[in-house]
A protein has these predicted regions:
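Membrane-proximal envelope and lipid/glycan-remodeling enzymes
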Residues: 1-307
Length: 307
């Protein structure tokens, strides 16, 4: 059920099919492999595994630099207390060759990109977005907007991820060492993404920037389903709800394709005007608003009527 929920019950499905050229499904796959090898590495550490993980981390970060946060997931895996964290740091200091190999492999992936940037611009580091004012506002994170707003809230347009988020609370009951790496990664990921000037990430179905981390979010989703299995009431209601949310996600995809969900962002009136409707109504076009990009580049977020 977890595989179905993540695979066809989220906006990952849309970006694997209708807009497969976007990088999110690729990064989802890379992070899935990275998570798998994190588990394998700590069961049986080796130079080969850490080198491959360095290559993976380099490619993941090259595709989307903010995904460097997956290294925190790797560092904190199976850490459940301050003493276990100290032990992890001490272990890596003693096994410094592992970190060195990972760092070299990480940088190797970036060398072709550095070379290309230097060739075309004369600079090793080059900002390729080319958008005036493209920056982070770390003192003005749009956490409420990015999570629960009608505009493009992650939990509004991908509600299965809200179930997964709640599932983080059940992780300590499943296994020690799961809670800290996932909670810290998710909180920092939300903070960083919500601090980007264009926190809604342009025209898209749902919050596409979160797709990359769905392999990590699958863990608490599985945990809450496992926890629910021991409860007479939740044993049936939670899986049923997830199946309904899978259907709802696919209905919303059709809404998005038919413009009943706007690609820029929505508002409360527009959302409820087309709720459970496959196509937009005449009133929908009257109440829809879009973001003011010029003001957003200054960290000011207001609606404006489309011309």
């Amino acid at each position: 059920l977890v595989l179905l929920a993540v695979g066809i019950g989220t906006n990952l499905f849309y970006y694997m099919t209708y807009e497969a050229a976007m990088p999110h499904a690729f990064n989802f796959s890379l992070i899935s492999i990275f998570v798998y090898f994190t588990l394998q590495f700590y069961q049986n550490p080796s130079y080969g595994k850490i080198g491959f993980m360095g290559l993976l981390a380099g490619l993941i970060t090259l595709i989307r630099p903010t995904n460097i946060l997956v290294l925190l997931f790797f560092l904190l895996w199976n850490v459940f207390s301050l003493s276990s964290f100290k032990s992890r740091i001490t272990w890596f200091l003693h096994q410094y060759k592992l970190i060195l190999i990972m760092a070299i492999a990480f940088i190797l992936v970036w060398i072709p990109q550095f070379s290309y940037w230097y060739w075309v611009s004369g600079e090793i580091f080059y900002f390729t977005y080319g958008e005036a004012g493209g920056k982070f506002f770390f003192l003005n994170p749009q956490i409420k907007n990015i999570l629960i707003s009608y505009k493009k809230g992650w939990f509004v347009y991908t509600p299965i991820m809200f179930v997964a988020f709640i599932g983080i609370l059940s992780l300590p009951k499943i296994k020690e060492g799961l809670f800290a790496p996932i909670l810290i990664f998710i909180i920092l990921n939300i903070y960083v993404l919500s601090s980007w000037w264009c926190w809604w990430f342009g025209g898209s179905f749902g919050l596409r920037a979160f797709i990359d981390c769905y392999a990590i979010m699958a863990i608490p989703l599985g945990a809450i389903l496992h926890f629910a299995h021991s409860n007479r009431w939740l044993k049936y209601t939670l899986p049923t709800m997830i199946i309904l949310l899978i259907g709802f996600n696919n209905f919303q995809i059709q809404q998005y394709k038919n413009s009943a969900i706007h690609y820029w962002w929505m508002n409360k009136e527009a959302y409820w005007e087309t709720f459970l409707k496959l196509r937009p109504t005449a009133r929908y076009w009257e109440v829809i608003t879009i973001p003011d990009y010029d003001k957003a580049r200054d960290g000011i977020y207001v609606d404006m009527k489309p011309e």
